[in-house]
Swiss-Prot record:
Residues forming the catalytic site: D45 (proton acceptor)
Keywords, in A-Z order: ATP-binding, Cytoplasm, Kinase, NAD, NADP, Nucleotide-binding, Transferase
GO biological process: NAD metabolic process; NADP biosynthetic process
High-level lineage: Bacteria, Bacillati, Bacillota, Bacilli, Bacillales
Species the sequence originates in: Staphylococcus saprophyticus subsp. saprophyticus (strain ATCC 15305 / DSM 20229 / NCIMB 8711 / NCTC 7292 / S-41)
Protein name in the entry: NAD kinase
Domain of life: Bacteria
Length: 269
């Protein structure tokens, strides 16, 4: 089995990474950061997001597993004291592969049709660089839907619906559903300006095209990465054809994670 390990970079995570590498030598597992079959992140959900972006070019050929050295995460489901068990499972087991939907973002510029393509595991947001009101036309499936005015828009995946989207009042969506969700960030609603005022859930075959009305510099975030764009013509969002693959060696139910993260006090029986 070819593997690679990405660490959060703190002392605890780095020590655990080196411990795992030494232990994996006993199983004749090969460390191969260029062509891994399994990508192990040690840290938290942020570390796994970084691992996803680093290996997004080979999603069909590798699977991800997370070890959390801090708080319980939605993606990192193994504890530091379980690493030896995990290594044995990786070496001996045919692991189950669970696939989650991703978000495709295509930024189109006014410069001779130039465009860039990105993938997000959690969400993408769109705002103005200087914090002024974002004014954009929202087009769904080729039809004008609304003119949005506000701080910005957040477009999330099902697994990302528990992150920024939840803080914006969006719905929680099970990752088995291939969909994306659009949530407003502080929209302006009065007698003159109106938006739908509710999160929108779009299925896989629906595309959302967002066109800036003014030529402001647009600030986008794609998971943990912030990018400034000038001279933007439009940004297209849809459910990506690619999916992220997680290696599962034991059950890790989505709704239990939601309960443990947002409801459980730690004292539940």
């Amino acid at each position: 089995m070819r593997y690679t390990i990405l660490s959060k970079g703190d002392s605890k995570s780095n020590a655990l990474k080196h411990k795992m590498i030494n232990h994996m030598k006993d199983f004749q597992m090969v460390e191969d950061p260029d062509n891994p079959e399994i990508v192990i992140s040690v840290g938290g959900d942020g570390t796994l997001l970084q691992a996803f972006h680093q290996y997004s070019y080979m999603l069909s050929r590798c699977a991800f597993v997370g070890i959390h050295t801090g708080h319980l995460g939605f993606y990192a489901d193994w504890l530091p004291h379980e690493v030896e068990k995990l290594i044995i499972e990786i070496n001996n087991s045919e692991f189950q592969v669970i696939e989650y939907p991703l978000l495709e973002i295509i930024v189109r510029y006014n410069d001779n049709g130039y465009e860039t393509r990105h993938l997000a595991l959690n969400e993408a947001t769109m705002k103005t660089e200087n914090g002024s009101t974002l004014v954009v036309d929202v087009n769904i499936r080729g039809n004008q839907f609304e003119r949005f005015r506000g701080d910005g828009l957040c477009i999330s995946t099902p697994s990302g619906s528990t992150a920024y989207n939840k803080a914006l009042g969006g719905a929680l969506i099970h990752p088995s559903l291939e969909a994306m969700q659009i949530a407003e960030i502080a929209s302006i609603n009065n007698r003159v300006f109106r938006t739908v005022g509710s999160p929108l859930v779009l299925p896989k075959h629906h595309t959302c095209l967002i066109t800036p009305v003014n030529q402001d510099t647009i600030l986008t975030t794609i998971d943990h990465v912030s990018i400034k764009h000038k001279n933007v013509n439009a940004i297209q969002y849809r459910v990506a054809n690619e999916k992220i693959r997680f290696a599962r060696f034991r059950p890790f139910p989505f709704w239990k994670r939601v309960h443990d993260s947002f409801i459980s006090s730690g004292d539940d029986e």
